[in-house]
Amino acid sequence: MFKWLHKKKDTMNRSKQTVMSDITPAHIEVLKENEIFVFGSNLQGIHGGGAAYIAKTHFGAIMGCGVGLQGQSYAIPTMQGGVKTIKPYVDEFIEFAKAHTEMHFLVTRIGCGIAGFRDEDIAPLFQNAISLANISLPKEFIDIILAQ
């Protein structure tokens, strides 16, 4: 994995440098010992499809547990309502990641599959994660955050 350094112009035409976290691979089949697969879930913890199913079958997600760290996975609920209902769980995840710098979190495109949200809906929720060295985000999310 590698770090990205992007320059962005703000509305005042000043140059900003934003240190980028690693980009989450599009397909994750194997994790290193310290890596955590971050996926979209439902509050009931029924990990029946999409990234949730992968988390259950490969990375230790527990049926019946819809939030937080489980094995080498971390569940963020995305199926309970609109984007506003997802934000507190993303904020909680970011605080968890800050407290656990020994772990590296690979965030998938949560909410952008079965839950039916667009990258443009979800990416801004991760604005405060973009500079954290132990959180990788999907390229789609990074591009949207940098464009803001």
Predicted features and spans:
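Macrodomain-like recognition of ADP-ribose-binding/processing modules
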Residues: 2-148
